[in-house]
């Protein structure tokens, strides 16, 4: 029995693995590649160039690989690359890149993108991230591994969301969020660190305590960023987790959420 519903429309140039499932009324355009074990639900639109890896599931009414609405876009060939084992829920929109950046939007592996979330052009999402319902990423946003953006989180273009960070519901992020930091509010403010997430992922208590001390250096001692980075040199040499935190601050181009 065919795994492709006869009511689906698939461009002859699209490349689908033999066991890909496609639901009714979905449209798969030219230049789309889909890896093995992936399930495309009903009423999904996939536009290329888009490469989707293995064992993904895309739910109904999602639009994946559409042209960017960026006013600079003039029809140049750009792409979307999606890795493996992602879940993309109902009504999600993901746009391809622009030639002014990498010409590519990237979604890594093992991510959960929940209903009505939006991933803008040229954004780069790592692995094991969760974008909760109605989260919206503007263009050129980077989200590192294990970050969680709660429902209705808004992220300004070019922001960098650090690994293992967490945003509360309705947070509006306009500056970079360092690794491990939790942010809340509109505009976003740093409140603490994602200690519960660290414990769930097996971080040692020693590493968690070191990060707690590092957070206080940056956010509680009234230091400038440069002064705080200097004070973190020694603990960063002892704890790789503190090094990740410090590096994410040092790499910031928009300034960090305070």
UniProtKB/Swiss-Prot annotation:
* Gene Ontology molecular-function annotations: acyl-[acyl-carrier-protein]-UDP-N-acetylglucosamine O-acyltransferase activity
Q: What is its main location?
A: cytoplasm
Tell me which Gene3D superfamilies the record gives.
Hexapeptide repeat proteins, Udp N-acetylglucosamine O-acyltransferase, C-terminal domain
Arranged from A to Z, the UniProt key words for this protein are: Acyltransferase, Cytoplasm, Lipid A biosynthesis, Lipid biosynthesis, Lipid metabolism, Repeat, Transferase
Top EC class for this record:
transferase
Give, as in the UniProt entry, the pathway in which the protein acts. Glycolipid biosynthesis; lipid IV(A) biosynthesis; lipid IV(A) from (3R)-3-hydroxytetradecanoyl-[acyl-carrier-protein] and UDP-N-acetyl-alpha-D-glucosamine: step 1/6
Which GO biological process categories is it annotated with? lipid A biosynthetic process
Classify the source by domain of life: Bacteria
Which reactions fall under this protein's catalytic activity? a (3R)-hydroxyacyl-[ACP] + UDP-N-acetyl-alpha-D-glucosamine = a UDP-3-O-[(3R)-3-hydroxyacyl]-N-acetyl-alpha-D-glucosamine + holo-[ACP]
Enzyme Commission number: 2.3.1.129
Q: Report if keyword Cytoplasm is assigned.
A: yes
Q: Which family does it belong to?
A: Belongs to the transferase hexapeptide repeat family. LpxA subfamily.
Alphabetized PANTHER family for the sequence: ACYL-[ACYL-CARRIER-PROTEIN]--UDP-N-ACETYLGLUCOSAMINE O-ACYLTRANSFERASE, ACYL-[ACYL-CARRIER-PROTEIN]--UDP-N-ACETYLGLUCOSAMINE O-ACYLTRANSFERASE, MITOCHONDRIAL-RELATED
Please describe what this protein does.
Answer: Involved in the biosynthesis of lipid A, a phosphorylated glycolipid that anchors the lipopolysaccharide to the outer membrane of the cell.
Subunit details: Homotrimer.
The protein's name is: Acyl-[acyl-carrier-protein]--UDP-N-acetylglucosamine O-acyltransferase
């Amino acid at each position: 029995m065919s795994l492709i519903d006869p009511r689906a429309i698939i461009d002859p140039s699209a490349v689908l693995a033999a066991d890909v499932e496609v639901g009714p009324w979905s449209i798969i355009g030219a230049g789309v590649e889909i890896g093995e074990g992936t399930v495309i639900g009903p009423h999904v639109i996939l536009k290329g160039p888009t490469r989707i890896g293995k064992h993904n599931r895309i739910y109904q009414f999602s639009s994946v690989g559409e042209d960017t609405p960026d006013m600079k876009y003039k029809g140049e060939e750009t792409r979307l690359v999606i890795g493996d084992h992602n879940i993309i829920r109902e009504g999600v929109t993901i746009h391809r890149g622009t030639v002014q950046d990498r010409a590519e939007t990237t979604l890594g592996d093992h991510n959960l993108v929940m209903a009505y979330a939006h991933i803008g052009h040229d954004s780069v999402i790592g692995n094991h991230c969760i974008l909760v319902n109605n989260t919206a990423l503007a263009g050129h946003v980077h989200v590192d591994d294990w970050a969680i953006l709660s429902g209705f989180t808004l992220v300004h273009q070019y922001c960098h969301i650090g690994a293992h960070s967490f945003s509360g519901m309705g947070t509006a992020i306009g500056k970079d969020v360092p690794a491990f930091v939790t942010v809340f509010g509109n505009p976003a403010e740093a409140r603490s660190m994602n200690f519960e997430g660290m414990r769930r992922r097996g971080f040692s208590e020693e590493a968690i305590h070191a990060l707690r001390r590092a957070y206080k250096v940056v956010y509680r001692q009234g230091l400038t960023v440069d002064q705080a980075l200097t004070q973190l040199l020694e603990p960063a040499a002892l704890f790789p987790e503190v090094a990740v935190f410090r590096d994410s601050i040092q790499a910031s181009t928009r300034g960090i959420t305070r």
